[in-house]
Amino acid sequence: MHKLNENDVTPEHIFFERRKIIQSMGLMGAASLLPRFSLAAEKQDSRQALHFAKDHNPQNLLLTPENKVIGYNNFYEFGVDKASPAKYASALKTEPWTLRIEGEVEKPMTFDVHQLMQQLPLEERIYRFRCVEAWSMVIPWIGFELNKLLALVQPTSQAKYVEFETLYEPDSMPGQKNHFFGGGLIYPYVEGLTMAEAMHPLTLLSVGLYGKTLAPQNGAPIRLVVPWKYGFKNIKSIVKITLKSEQPMTTWHHAAPHEYGFYANVNPEVDHPRWSQASERVIGSGGLLSVKRQPTLLFNGYAEQVAHLYQDLDLRTYF
């Protein structure tokens, strides 16, 4: 079996550009500073089967092989290398897990995520996934629409934005404990949507993929999936949701506002400052020689469903 490495699925100029930046920050070799987080931390697959309504895939999208979906990840809390999350994330304890929703709501509530999975009917959604680094997958997520959960807390008329926050637990997330290992980001990881985006029926809170609960490296036990936005908006391992009247400051926008906008909609006409977004490398079943490129679609192919959300916005200014 071909062992996937970062150069297999990231365009060469992006691969070396990112390596250069990481080296300049002293991040290469940072794993050696973390002996407690052993590379032997990988465990056998402990994901559980889920009951859900099947997506019959009317668009006939070709699914990315499961081993690549769970083996090639961005989750800086477990390191900046694509293989690091699968190596280190097994230290994350995902049960019990609570999700707090507060802010501009009539009924602030704390949910047990595993009870929530029984309370709200689960469905499969086969979505395109586009990383800002210009690679893509097709993933069969399992979850429920975010709007169904928000309806339970009754948002007020002042709720204009939704802020999401990842677990902050440095003892199990080495990237939070070591500044270099975690890519120099400020934690906990924070993301946000407009209220209209959050209430859109395509916006999913995922608790599984490929018929089973999420692996820790994929954001277990609950993560956001917004298929028309770049992957960094799809925040993982969520512990808190806050409805706000003002736009929240999000992690990557804070780190590099000229490179990572708040909206982060997939747009082939708006390049990243350091690489083109006009096309993407498709992660498939083969190795380096079989990887293909394809044109990137506006809103990742979901323009018909979501373009109206941005009809009054200049997509170059509000990227």
UniProtKB/Swiss-Prot annotation:
Pfam families on file: Oxidored_molyb
GO biological process, one term: protein repair
Gene3D superfamilies: Oxidoreductase, molybdopterin-binding domain
Signal listed as a keyword: yes
Swiss-Prot/TrEMBL cofactor(s): Mo-molybdopterin
Leader peptide range in chain numbering: 1-40
Domain of life of the native organism: Bacteria
InterPro entries for the chain: MsrP, OxRdtase_Mopterin-bd_dom, OxRdtase_Mopterin-bd_sf
EC numbers on record: 1.8.5.-
PTM description: Predicted to be exported by the Tat system. The position of the signal peptide cleavage has not been experimentally proven.
Cofactor remark: Binds 1 Mo-molybdopterin (Mo-MPT) cofactor per subunit.
Leading EC class: oxidoreductase
Catalytic activity line of the entry: L-methionyl-[protein] + a quinone + H2O = L-methionyl-(S)-S-oxide-[protein] + a quinol; L-methionyl-[protein] + a quinone + H2O = L-methionyl-(R)-S-oxide-[protein] + a quinol
Function field: Part of the MsrPQ system that repairs oxidized periplasmic proteins containing methionine sulfoxide residues (Met-O), using respiratory chain electrons. Thus protects these proteins from oxidative-stress damage caused by reactive species of oxygen and chlorine generated by the host defense mechanisms. MsrPQ is essential for the maintenance of envelope integrity under bleach stress, rescuing a wide series of structurally unrelated periplasmic proteins from methionine oxidation.
Quaternary structure note: Heterodimer of a catalytic subunit (MsrP) and a heme-binding subunit (MsrQ).
Official protein name in the record: Protein-methionine-sulfoxide reductase catalytic subunit MsrP
Taxonomic source organism: Pasteurella multocida (strain Pm70)
Lineage, uppermost ranks: Bacteria, Pseudomonadati, Pseudomonadota, Gammaproteobacteria, Pasteurellales
